[in-house]
């Protein structure tokens, strides 16, 4: 699984703000990320979270803490 999909899966399953280290830990423990396939998992998680935040898919709550952004289409349902 790519870091983007792994991060979104963890944040969807947890449905709560998480520190990036917890997101990384859960993704590794659940087998979403393989440190042998993804070199430098830490950097991958951090840069992917920044990219997802700039796209509006995740929001930053505090330093290093992220949560899944509420989508406009989800709010209407």
What are these model-derived regions, one by one?
Residues 1-13, 28-77:
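Phospho-regulated, low-complexity intrinsically disordered regions of nuclear gene-regulatory
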Residues 11-21:
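Short capping segments at the starts of secondary-structure elements
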Residues 22-26:
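A short acidic, leucine-rich amphipathic alpha-helix
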